[in-house]
Curated annotation (Swiss-Prot):
Pfam families: ATP-synt_DE, ATP-synt_DE_N. GO terms for cellular component: plastid thylakoid membrane; proton-transporting ATP synthase complex. F-type ATPases have 2 components, CF(1) - the catalytic core - and CF(0) - the membrane proton channel. CF(1) has five subunits: alpha(3), beta(3), gamma(1), delta(1), epsilon(1). CF(0) has three main subunits: a, b and c. It is found in: Plastid thylakoid membrane. Belongs to the ATPase epsilon chain family. This is ATP synthase epsilon chain, plastid. InterPro entries: ATP_synth_F1_dsu/esu, ATP_synth_F1_dsu/esu_N, ATP_synth_F1_esu_C, ATPsynth_dsu/esu_N. NCBIfam families: ATP_synt_epsi. Produces ATP from ADP in the presence of a proton gradient across the membrane. Keywords: ATP synthesis, CF(1), Hydrogen ion transport, Ion transport, Membrane, Plastid, Thylakoid, Transport. GO terms for molecular function: proton-transporting ATP synthase activity, rotational mechanism.
Amino acid sequence: MTLKLCVLTPNRIFWDSEVEEIILSTNSGQIGILPTHTPIATSVDIGILRIRLNGRWLTMALMGGFARIGNNEITVLVNDAERSSDIDPQEAQQTVEIAEANFRKAKGKRQKIEANIALCRARTRVKAVSPISVGK
């Protein structure tokens, strides 16, 4: 038995196919979803989406949103998504360093919040390409 996974960003259908299992980062922690999962709606955190397809794990970086699970269908609406295979590890690490510097320099509540979000996004991209996350 499989699950139908659809990941949507504002600009495109990012993923639309059958999968065996997923592990999704939510605001209350990671959840594993297998066929016949209890129906739920949840917020999606800036974090990693792991997809098991044909016995192998794929890793993606998700940039926050919402998910609906029910009847062996998962619909994930996110601000942005990126496959680990599309991320340049060196560029991702440089982005973290820039985001950390911007976070340290941030003044005022709004700047600190925006800098923190940018840092979370940058760290998620690095995590998506780390050997432990990729799961080869």
